[in-house]
Amino acid sequence: MDLKTVLSLPRYPGEFLHPVVYACTAVMLLCLLASFVTYIVHQSAIRISRKGRHTLLNFCFHAALTFTVFAGGINRTKYPILCQAVGIVLHYSTLSTMLWIGVTARNIYKQVTKKAPLCLDTDQPPYPRQPLLRFYLVSGGVPFIICGVTAATNIRNYGTEDEDTAYCWMAWEPSLGAFYGPAAIITLVTCVYFLGTYVQLRRHPGRRYELRTQPEEQRRLATPEGGRGIRPGTPPAHDAPGASVLQNEHSFQAQLRAAAFTLFLFTATWAFGALAVSQGHFLDMVFSCLYGAFCVTLGLFVLIHHCAKREDVWQCWWACCPPRKDAHPALDANGAALGRAACLHSPGLGQPRGFAHPPGPCKMTNLQAAQGHASCLSPATPCCAKMHCEPLTADEAHVHLQEEGAFGHDPHLHGCLQGRTKPPYFSRHPAEEPEYAYHIPSSLDGSPRSSRTDSPPSSLDGPAGTHTLACCTQGDPFPMVTQPEGSDGSPALYSCPTQPGREAALGPGHLEMLRRTQSLPFGGPSQNGLPKGKLLEGLPFGTDGTGNIRTGPWKNETTV
């Protein structure tokens, strides 16, 4: 054994690659797998076109196949048949991945340059649904033909070129025409699509989102009450396109940047991986680290752009998580936990805040309040509950609100919390106030009650012909004690605050009733749950000699 053989270093990569290659490849595979599974499981809930979903799924699959075979078999030179198979798979998957990126660029360009349909009132869609087989024939068939011709010409074109080659790939001369030439053409055509899309977006700044054409029947159903509940001259709620008509949540500019950056990351990762297994002992470590950095960047970019930056994907992810148990369950009037959790229901995205029943009076009995059908009494946070309304009867206590016009629609929830020391008063102009009838609810035996389950605060705000009742609970400094018969205490009062800039938009029919709580300057609470002393003297509404409560402009009385 001569000195040269003793001092010579083993040829790289040897039996194993640098550890950073395996670690970073595993991270990228996890990111691609998460994106792939998300778009497979929740394909009906994610707003993306059919072409975009297929191109993304195929890109994730072929990119994962490319780097998995690279990390696991690029240095298996001791097994000739396995080495040839690794070279064939790398050849096919690399060209297929680049072609799927090119198909993505082509689809973006077609969407940007697509003209608006001439007729929207026909039952047939203006653009027929085209099959996706052509994309699979191009992105999967072309690489298959190239690999088949190369292998049929000479199977030894794959594998190790000679004994000194330490990686499984292709011979140099066949690779020029079978791989590097087609890869360069694909990259050039893809860049031309990118440039054309960029020019079109600069010339037409208004083309920002990919919209989905809706049939006439769906457009009529999307209009509130078939187009009858909209006031004439009412401006649209917002200028941006609605979520129901978006074909893709990302804009064209975001899709263009993502496709271009994906092509750059994939090309750079592949190049650094090839240099990591073909260079000397020191450069292999440098290029292995560069390969790992770009590999992780590619996986994280795909996961962040296509999943983490999309609201619909986040909704799908949260829907898969088990719901948390309420740490503070709602209690009824007797202190028992309520079995019904439907009171914590909140309106979903795009749903009107109201009930689909004809306009009519709404009533709430004490029995329903005690059973938990009327309000939510969560001691932690206020909640907004939906209550079913029934026709008004003459022998039951109720809260009757009669309006002359239609309610204005407000898609946002009202703020429920108000200050204790500054209770809101009626500030609506008398000329704008419709006629309201407020009746103090009574118990089942006819005696008035002061519990907050008897007369919950409510807020009415919804489209025409609908009512929305939201209970807004606050910390009550008074104990929940039923008022005995013959007591001279008065039940709690409610007020209607107004918010600047909202009264004109909501219309005269808007009424928001909140519980009025005050400090106790005249003494502590009595046994009936109300403060002692002459606290009622400072209230805007007093009582007459017969014990009736006068409620200001309503002039309705309830005899105790």
From Swiss-Prot:
Gene Ontology cellular-component terms listed: glutamatergic synapse; membrane; plasma membrane; postsynaptic density
Compartments, record wording: Membrane
The entry's keywords: G-protein coupled receptor, Glycoprotein, Membrane, Receptor, Transducer, Transmembrane, Transmembrane helix
Topology class, membrane: Multi-pass membrane protein
Pfam families listed in its UniProt record: 7tm_2 (PF00002)
Ranges where the record places region Disordered: 210-242, 438-473, 521-560
Listed InterPro entries: Adhesion_GPCR_A (IPR051963), GPCR_2-like_7TM (IPR017981), GPCR_2_secretin-like (IPR000832), GPCR_2_secretin-like_CS (IPR017983)
Compositional bias ranges of the Low complexity kind: 447-459, 529-542
Gene Ontology BP, a term: signal transduction
UniProt-listed PROSITE patterns: G_PROTEIN_RECEP_F2_2, G_PROTEIN_RECEP_F2_4
Ranges that cross the membrane: 20-40, 54-74, 85-105, 135-155, 176-196, 258-278, 285-305
Lineage: Eukaryota, Metazoa, Chordata, Craniata, Vertebrata
Biological role: Orphan receptor.
Native source organism of the sequence: Homo sapiens
UniProt-recorded Gene Ontology molecular function terms: G protein-coupled receptor activity
Name this protein carries in UniProt: Adhesion G protein-coupled receptor A1
Ranges per topology, Extracellular: 1-19, 75-84, 156-175, 279-284
Superkingdom to which the source organism belongs: Eukaryota
